[in-house]
Structure formats: structure tokens, C-alpha cells
Regions:
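Glycine-rich flexible loop motifs, especially short His-Gly-Gly/GGXG/HXGH segments used as catalytic or interaction
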Residues: 185-220
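A structural signal for short, hydrophobic/glycine-enriched beta-strand patches
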Residues: 2-195
Length: 220
């Protein structure tokens, strides 16, 4: 048993409940794929190589599911971001959806800015947990049977924990590349402990969510 017994038991309970939920809904039709966005965009408009790699992996899955006669939709999260004071011209969602459409994905199979606004309002989608919250909300409200997430290898555990906190457990797929935004050591010793200590899934009244929003949301 881990040193922090109560925290371990709490998360074990959440994980078991999430698995039970997925077992109950697997009879439903359809797969929802969340493609974790990655800032900054190239020239403020185009997905960077890490983001593009995830989108390419999702496209392959999309095409395979369609070939097998399955219904599949994709959600690309992410509001308009800034980094080091430089703001992207469009949202991560718009950049990702544009990329997917250009590579043959039916635009009617895409969720992006509309979902961000519906579930996060003016707060926007500015961290991994926001991404998972919106994807979970879409998954529940639209009655999908399966959920998949494509993300950074270093980011995968924290995103899985976010999903578990929101009551679901997707099929998690990591997409490696040479230069990654997320760092394994930072995740293990900074970001995951902060997430576990937050208690809200970085949602309502979260100090960490507020910090990230102030860091990444452009000043209009």
C-alpha cells in the first residue's frame, strides 16, 4: 500500500468507477477521438510537428474505423494561445480541424471551437484537464461507445488521471517525436503532484487552472 493510503484508495475507487462506466457504454455505437493539441502554432496558424504527428496518427485511426463501417468523430481541443507574449492567430482547435479537413477528414466528423465554447465558455481550453473535461462531456452527451486519446508520451499519465477524475477511461495512445513540449521529469515531480493536490481536475476555483489561463490566454 502506498504511503498516502487515503489518496491511493480514493483514486483506486475513481479508476474502478471509470472502468465500470466504459464497460456499460461499450454497447453504444461510435468512437470519439480526442487529439491533444500542442502550442505554439507555426506562423500562428499551422500545427507544429508534434501536433501534426498526433493529428496524423488520428487520421490513420479515423480511416481504419471508417473502412470497418464504424462511426467515428474527432475532437481537437484548444483555445487561442500565446507563448512568451506571442499570440497565435487562431485557436488550436481551428488549426487542428483545418489540418484534418485538408487531409481528407469530413468536416461533419469534427468538433473543435464549438465544443470548447459549449463546455468551457469564456474560460476556454488552456490545459490538459480542460481538454479531457470537454472530451468527456462530448462522449457522455452524444452517447459514444468508445473514447480514445492521442497525446504526448510524457503527458499520457496526467491525461489518463484527468479522464479518470471525470469518470471515464479512454484508450490512451502516445505519439512520440524528436522534440516534445512535455518533459518526463517535470510531469513526474511537478505537474502530476500539482494535479493530484488540486482536487478539482483543474476546473472550478482551481488556482493552477487560473495560473495556466493567465499564462496562455491572449489579452484581447
Amino acid at each position: 500500500m502506498p504511503a498516502n493510503d487515503s489518496q491511493f484508495l480514493h483514486w483506486r475507487k475513481l479508476a474502478d468507477e471509470a472502468r465500470n462506466t466504459m464497460a456499460q457504454v461499450q454497447k453504444n455505437d461510435g468512437l470519439l477521438i480526442e487529439v491533444a493539441a500542442q502550442h505554439p502554432l507555426i506562423d500562428g496558424v499551422y500545427p507544429n510537428p508534434e501536433f501534426s504527428a498526433r493529428l496524423d496518427a488520428a487520421i490513420k485511426r479515423y480511416e481504419l474505423e471508417r473502412q470497418n463501417g464504424e462511426m467515428v468523430k474527432l475532437y481537437v481541443p484548444g483555445s487561442r494561445h500565446m507563448q512568451d507574449g506571442v499570440a497565435d492567430q487562431i485557436s488550436l482547435s481551428a488549426a487542428g480541424c483545418n489540418y484534418l479537413e485538408t487531409h481528407g477528414v469530413d468536416p461533419t466528423d469534427l468538433y473543435g471551437e464549438d465544443a470548447n465554447l459549449k463546455y468551457k465558455g469564456d474560460d476556454g481550453v488552456y490545459n490538459s484537464s480542460d481538454e479531457c473535461y470537454v472530451a468527456t462531456s462530448l462522449f457522455r452527451d452524444l452517447g459514444f461507445g468508445r473514447l480514445a486519446s492521442y497525446c504526448s508520451p510524457a503527458q499520457l499519465m496526467r491525461k489518463a488521471l484527468s479522464y479518470i477524475q471525470f469518470g471515464v477511461l479512454p484508450y490512451m495512445y502516445s505519439v512520440p517525436c524528436e522534440h516534445m513540449f512535455h518533459d518526463y521529469v517535470d510531469e513526474a515531480f511537478i505537474h502530476i503532484p500539482v494535479f493530484l493536490g488540486d482536487g478539482t481536475g483543474l476546473q472550478v476555483n482551481s488556482d493552477e487552472a487560473k495560473r495556466l489561463r493567465e499564462l496562455r490566454k491572449p489579452v484581447e
